Amino acid sequence: LRVHFPLNKELVKAVEGVSFSINQGETLAVVGESGSGKSVTAMSILRLNDMAGAEMPTGSIKLRLKNNEVVDMFETSEKDLVNIRGNHVSMIFQEPMTCLNPVLTVGLQISEAIMIHQGLNEEKARDKTLEMLNLVRIPDPNKVINSYPHHFSGGMRQRVMIAMALSCRPQLLIADEPTT
């Protein structure tokens, strides 16, 4: 994998020649100094660097979907990426406050992801949301489901993001800075 960002008529080589393979049930930790490309690598798997101004990464990211179909994330259409993100691959971002919508309740945000990716109706998605909030040990999920992100500490917002990421049972879970 190679990812370059244009900067002042030059290219910054954010990731240069990273290669790894992850099989079902395995855990992989990517470690390195600050600025070494760990987050860029993680974002590349979901093709989120496209939105951050990166040139199209080179290399390939092959993903075996739940139906055993193998796709190359760099050759996948935007429409198919919507299905893959969340349903097959989820990411827990480093800073939950930048990922959670401040004007929507956390319950609605988790439920929407479930309805989009699992096709559940509103009532069943709400039940699944409560189940996920319980799973990540958020106290009083029936109250929390109607609360807004700014009502929570950073650690509780992180748990909300974990609940959302796990809600669709992805095959690959990416955690950016999981220990912060």
Briefly describe each language-model feature range:
Residues 110, 162:
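Hydrophobic anchor residue at the start of the ABC signature
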Residues 147-152, 156:
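Conserved ABC ATPase signature
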Residues 167-171:
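A short, proline-enriched helix->beta-strand linker immediately N-terminal to the Walker B motif
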Residues 6, 60-83, 121:
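ABC ATPase NBD Q-loop/coupling interface
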Residues 173-176:
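Catalytic Walker B motif of ABC-type/P-loop ATPase nucleotide-binding domains
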Residues 62, 124-143:
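Conserved ABC ATPase "signature" region
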